[in-house]
């Protein structure tokens, strides 16, 4: 069995690492390069770097921060936020990113993932899925359609009456009538090499990952799934692997504020029978 990965996430606004509840009311958790160095020393398996305001405020990607971070860490670095073109991907990879994470642009144009994976390779294209639970009262017509909603090749990803989870974009601010599980399968088909799956209902709450959501998507695809949103204890990390079948667990605040170290997390998981790199 492949080793399970522990991945800290640096949510960045204005060049500073922040972590809020549901991406709002952000807290300041320090300098991104300092955080990256800390995680490098702690032997985190990877690092995810997300500009949480890039899509919403239409800010350009902070290439210099990526370059400074990539120059001092030796673990794989995934970078997302505000990626709108193939040139943006090229610039990030040239700046030192190993992978790029794409959400809003893929929702606007699903074929962008096909183009990106063809040009740069599936191994560096991560589809970020920010999912929210819905019930029978959800009204898909309350949300503006995308231009591709009439595309027959993509009709299977649209919201249906039995959909349990839909996509959200722009940092969770905008819900979309797109079924999250069907979308994950389509993005794999289009060439995405990995899924960064965030439960927007759990993000920042420290109540644990959404096991039902994560397991449903992990079982629907064959590419790796990173569980995100809700980690508050080491037991939550264990649950992501043991029950939700995730390949990796992402967390921010429990590591940023030094409640637990990466080493503590890995030792805890090892003792519970989860294969990790020590």
Swiss-Prot record:
One GO cellular component, as annotated: cytoplasm
Gene3D superfamilies the record matches: Aldolase class I
Top-level lineage group: Bacteria
Active site, per annotation: 11, 130
GO molecular function, a single term: imidazoleglycerol-phosphate synthase activity
Catalysis: reaction(s): 5-[(5-phospho-1-deoxy-D-ribulos-1-ylimino)methylamino]-1-(5-phospho-beta-D-ribosyl)imidazole-4-carboxamide + L-glutamine = D-erythro-1-(imidazol-4-yl)glycerol 3-phosphate + 5-amino-1-(5-phospho-beta-D-ribosyl)imidazole-4-carboxamide + L-glutamate + H(+)
This protein's UniProt keywords: Amino-acid biosynthesis, Cytoplasm, Histidine biosynthesis, Lyase
GO BP, one annotated term: L-histidine biosynthetic process
Pfam families named in the record: His_biosynth
Protein function: IGPS catalyzes the conversion of PRFAR and glutamine to IGP, AICAR and glutamate. The HisF subunit catalyzes the cyclization activity that produces IGP and AICAR from PRFAR using the ammonia provided by the HisH subunit.
Protein name per its UniProtKB record: Imidazole glycerol phosphate synthase subunit HisF
Primary gene name: hisF
